[in-house]
A protein has these predicted regions:
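Central beta-strand plus flanking loop segment that forms part of the substrate or channel wall
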Residues: 1-31
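Rossmann-like NAD(P)H-binding beta-loop-alpha module
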Residues: 23-48
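FAD/FMN-dependent oxidoreductases across multiple families
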Residues: 40-47, 56, 69-149, 162-168, ...
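Short, well-ordered beta-strand elements
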Residues: 59-66
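Active-site-proximal substrate-binding core of FAD-dependent oxidoreductases
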Residues: 133, 152-205
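C-terminal auxiliary extensions adjacent to catalytic cores
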Residues: 197-260
Length: 260
């Protein structure tokens, strides 16, 4: 059964800027483009992230946040988007632009656990409707897999119609194509990743620990001896109240999700 932890809400703005301005601001040439992904304070403590990418004469920016975390924090999605747009890193990039589109989209992010029945009698399910959104943090595949599954569905449908059999069995070529083209194997291989990545410690606790370590190591100590890395790590884990056993367990779970 799906919960608010398995779904995210994306809200996006498309802002018009002339091509010359885009190329100048983002140091682009010809058909080049750029994509930025953001984590941290831009989502105000809500689990998720934000993005910005260029198009030919527009740029798109938005946030994608977990439904359960959004409800818990009692934050409106458009407030997060406005906060992101006003961030000192982002504001100069969108300055002078004109809003031409606003959209929202529910994103299935539970991976293997929420894949739908792909074929039935006279029916094929593709894209988000089938749960084919591959969001592991390390890899983000939404549009790509929607295109891949749509193409596979079209080919399977044509094959079934030519054979005169549009039953679930006659449409089995759809699943076969998704297997052969690596879509379904990816979901199986990284089946543990979505829950690990969207966990509270990965989204909240450990980023705080990492930034604390960086501050201890990189910030000037005002004449005091500089810290070595291991004492800085130990001190930050102690400050955050994270026992070493918990860290080792999370490293093991992260390895299972991504490493082997």
């Amino acid at each position: 059964e799906l919960t608010g932890h398995d779904l995210s809400l994306g809200v996006k703005e498309v802002i018009a800027l002339d091509r010359h301005t885009l190329e100048e601001r983002f140091q682009l040439e010809g058909d080049q483009g750029v994509t930025y992904e953001f984590l941290g304070s831009v989502t105000g403590g809500v689990a998720g992230g934000s993005f910005l990418y260029t198009n030919r004469e527009t740029l798109s920016l938005g946030v994608i946040v977990e439904i359960a975390s959004l409800a818990e924090r009692r934050v409106r999605p458009h407030e997060l988007l406005e906060r992101f747009r006003a961030h000192p890193t982002v504001a100069p990039l969108v300055r002078g632009g004109r809003l031409v589109e606003y959209s929202a989209h529910m994103v299935p992010e539970a991976g293997q656990r929420m894949l739908a029945t792909l074929a039935g009698d006279g029916m094929l399910v593709a894209g988000d409707a089938a749960g084919l959104c591959f969001a592991t943090g390390l890899y983000l595949e939404g549009i790509n897999y929607a295109i891949a599954s749509g193409r596979a569905a079209g080919e399977a449908a044509a094959e079934a119609l030519a054979a005169g059999d549009t039953s679930a069995a006659g449409l089995a070529g759809y699943r076969r194509r998704l297997e052969e083209r690596g879509v379904l194997p990816d979901f199986r291989r990284f089946r543990l990743a979505p829950r690990f990545v969207m966990g509270e410690r990965v989204h909240g606790l450990y980023p705080g620990v990492v930034t604390g370590i960086a501050e201890r190591v990189l910030r000037s100590q005002g004449g005091r001896p500089k810290q070595k890395l291991l004492p800085a790590v130990t001190a930050e884990l102690r400050r955050a109240g994270v026992p070493l056993r918990r860290v080792l367990r999370d490293l093991w779970e992260g390895g299972r999700a991504f490493g082997w």
